[in-house]
């Protein structure tokens, strides 16, 4: 992607480094429980059980597919932007070194890719995790046409800094000639700031699922 090498301010450069705790990386301010490799399907910390969460995710994924089925045909260089933790990967409910895909989102993304959409991830995880993150995404069968990781300074700036970084990433994607037809995330900072035709919000239970 244009500026993907030089755009260090957006944290796009893929760097080989030991990964940080995945559960701490995509929040900008808070950490998640778990991270030991054991699943927490019963929820905890005020979260609902996995069965309720995945049902709610499936509802949003179906809404997104209905919209994209009408929008993708004829779109010029369509792209879908996604957050990663608890949007694309089951970071809270199934933490571990290789985090499983969220099945309804994976199915949506694979279908959209087959319809000609580029799949671009914009995550709050620091850019030094990009290689690790991309390896996880591809291992669970996500297509990856682009991956933006945040500068380390973003994590210390809280949700406002995360929102600014993610907005700038979408501006950069548009600068590469893409039309962002959908932006999917589970936190307000994933979706605020515009530069997407439509947003789809997955549950975050008032910030408890970051």
Please tell me what each predicted stretch does:
Residues 2-82:
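Non-catalytic pre-domain segments flanking phosphatase-related domains
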Residues 26-27, 34, 130-210:
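C-terminal cap/substrate-recognition subdomain and adjoining C-terminal extension
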Residues 46-55, 93-99, 120-125, 156-160:
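Second-shell loop/turn segments in exported
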Residues 62, 66, 103-110, 131-135, ...:
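Solvent-exposed, polar/charged alpha-helical surfaces in well-ordered, non-transmembrane soluble domains
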Residues 69, 73, 110-118, 127, ...:
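Sec-exported extracytoplasmic/periplasmic mature domains
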Residues 73-79, 119-125, 149, 181-184:
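Surface-exposed patches in mature extracellular/periplasmic domains of secreted proteins
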């Amino acid at each position: 992607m244009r500026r993907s090498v030089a755009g260090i301010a957006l944290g796009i450069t893929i760097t080989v480094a030991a990964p940080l705790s995945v559960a701490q990386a995509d929040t900008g301010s808070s950490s998640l429980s778990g991270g030991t490799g054991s699943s927490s399907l019963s929820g905890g910390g005020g979260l609902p059980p996995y069965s309720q969460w995945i049902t709610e995710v499936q509802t949003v994924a179906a809404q997104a597919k209905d919209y994209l089925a009408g929008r993708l045909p004829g779109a010029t260089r369509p792209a879908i932007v996604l957050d990663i933790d608890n949007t694309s990967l089951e970071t809270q409910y199934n933490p571990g070194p290789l985090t499983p895909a969220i099945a309804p989102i994976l199915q949506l993304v694979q279908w959209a890719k087959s319809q000609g959409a580029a799949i671009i991830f914009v995550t709050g995880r620091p850019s030094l995790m990009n290689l690790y993150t991309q390896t996880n995404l591809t291992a669970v069968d996500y297509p990856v046409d682009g991956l933006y990781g945040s500068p380390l300074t973003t994590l210390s700036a809280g949700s406002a800094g995360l929102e600014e970084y993610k907005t700038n990433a979408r501006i950069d994607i548009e600068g590469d000639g893409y039309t962002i037809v959908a932006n999917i995330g589970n936190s307000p900072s994933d979706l605020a700031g515009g530069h997407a035709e439509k947003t789809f919000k997955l549950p975050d239970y008032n910030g408890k699922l970051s």
